Amino acid sequence: MSDSLNAAALDQLFRTARTQNAFADTPVSQEVLRELYELVKWGPTAANSGPARFVFVTSADGKARLKPALSEGNAAKTLAAPVTVIVAHDEDFHEKLPYLFPHADAKSWFDGPREGRAESAFRNGSLQGAYLILAARALGLDAGPMSGFDNAKVDAAFFAGTPIKSNFLVNLGYGDPAGLFPRSPRLSFDEAARFE
């Protein structure tokens, strides 16, 4: 492992990064979004399964399809964000394991009813969604993750007839500090962790 990141990098990723509720009217190019995925894909998942699937909603048509699924409190900021990422997971992710994990017959570990692998798809897809937030920050983007939406409506609008299920949404862009809430506290180490 290489040396630790410097304090400025750690601030950008964690300490001074904020969940954004408003964004500048500055587009995010497809090239930047492709670069973002090229970072995300290297984050670890069980058996290198990579079950996450990402839809980068940037068009007016895409936002119009997303709008009916949004909760009232999340609609305006999501429709105004340059990018809304639907972080989803493929419940048939195991079909790609012969390519992604050639060291063993990993596909056979997940054969059987889809329900049996849904938990792994959700868990590892959630990990990849977290990597997306950190990768976005590393590239100078701001993120606003949220779960206030109707998953069934998103799935019907974007994933109908597929084994892909939505998990959460992340608005991306260049944050407008005017939309920030005051910084909320976090639990201390002793409140959230322990040694055994």
Swiss-Prot record:
EC class name: oxidoreductase
Annotated GO MF terms: oxidoreductase activity
CDD domains per record: RutE-like
A UniProt-annotated Pfam family: Nitroreductase
EC number(s) recorded for this UniProt protein: 1.-.-.-
Keywords: Flavoprotein, FMN, NAD, NADP, Oxidoreductase
Cofactor requirement: FMN
Record InterPro entries: Nitroreductase, Nitroreductase-like, Nitroreductase_HadB/RutE, RutE-like
Family in the record: Belongs to the nitroreductase family. HadB/RutE subfamily.
This protein's name: Putative NADH dehydrogenase/NAD(P)H nitroreductase XOO4023
Species per Swiss-Prot/TrEMBL record: Xanthomonas oryzae pv. oryzae (strain MAFF 311018)
